[in-house]
């Protein structure tokens, strides 16, 4: 089973236009779902994505990608 990324296109700290290409570089075969994730509180302040149904957040997109890569390499 492949990885799954879920991101919000409405949260203030998440820029879907730049985040999705970065996620595709991490795993080009992953499923990417865009839409409200009901994670609005943290989503106002931090960039985030759900990785295989687990939330991962960081102050910047680049830090988020590092955390996602670490999570997938466990």
UniProtKB/Swiss-Prot annotation:
It comes from Bacillus anthracis. This is UPF0741 protein BA_5632/GBAA_5632/BAS5234. Belongs to the UPF0741 family. It comes from the Bacteria.
């Amino acid at each position: 089973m492949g990885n799954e990324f879920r991101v919000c296109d409405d949260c203030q700290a998440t820029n879907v236009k730049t985040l999705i290409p970065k996620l595709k570089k991490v795993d080009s075969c992953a499923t990417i779902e865009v839409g409200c994730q009901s994670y609005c509180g943290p989503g106002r302040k931090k960039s985030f994505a759900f990785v295989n149904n687990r939330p991962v957040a960081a102050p910047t997109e680049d830090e988020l990608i590092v955390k996602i890569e670490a999570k997938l390499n466990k």
